[in-house]
């Protein structure tokens, strides 16, 4: 069941509607900073500390996230495994991956169609906001 989209005032370059996002990141400081930055941009945020928690939230929401923003390299279940499982359950699911490792970016290429982009770490909060806005704009 899709959620209701609420319009809000925007500044230039900002996505015009609030989106429901899931941030999956094992580093608590990165997870918290990204969540705050995206909340300030007007989005509703859920967070998970690893891919297993992320997949559980995706299942509970019945795939109802506009975008999942996930680290690739995490304990328990990594972002690639989570993306594959989420795509099998919800083929329309779109995921933006983050990584600090060049070799992990290559692993993401096998998920074309599910992965909308890979953000290289470290990144600024402005960069992550801009990449999320670009990813969301692709689906408007």
Outline where the language-model segments fall.
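Active-site beta3 strand of CheY-like receiver
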Residues: 63-69
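Short hydrophobic/Thr-rich beta-strand motif most characteristic of the beta2 strand and flanking loop
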Residues: 42-49, 55-58
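Conserved acidic carboxylate
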Residues: 25
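Receiver (REC) domain active-site loop signature in two-component systems and cognate sites
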Residues: 74
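Charged docking surfaces used in two-component/phosphorelay signaling
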Residues: 32-40
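Alpha4 helix (beta4-alpha4-beta5 surface) of REC/receiver domains from two-component response regulators
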Residues: 81, 92-94, 101-120, 126, ...
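Active-site residues of response regulator receiver
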Residues: 71, 99
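Acidic catalytic/metal-coordinating carboxylates
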Residues: 50-53, 78-82
């Amino acid at each position: 069941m899709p959620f209701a989209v609420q319009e809000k005032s925007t500044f230039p370059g900002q996505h015009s509607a609030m989106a429901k996002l899931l941030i999956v990141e094992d580093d608590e400081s990165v997870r918290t900073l990204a969540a705050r930055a995206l909340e300030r941009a007007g989005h509703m945020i859920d967070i998970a500390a690893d891919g297993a928690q992320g997949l559980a939230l995706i299942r509970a929401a019945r795939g109802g996230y506009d975008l999942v923003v996930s680290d690739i390299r995490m304990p328990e279940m990594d972002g690639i495994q989570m993306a594959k499982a989420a795509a099998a359950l919800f083929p329309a699911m779109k995921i933006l991956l983050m990584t600090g490792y060049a070799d992990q970016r290559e692993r993401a290429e096998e998920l074309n169609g599910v992965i909308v982009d890979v953000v290289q770490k470290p990144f600024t909060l402005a960069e992550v906001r801009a990449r999320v806005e670009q990813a969301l704009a692709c689906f408007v």
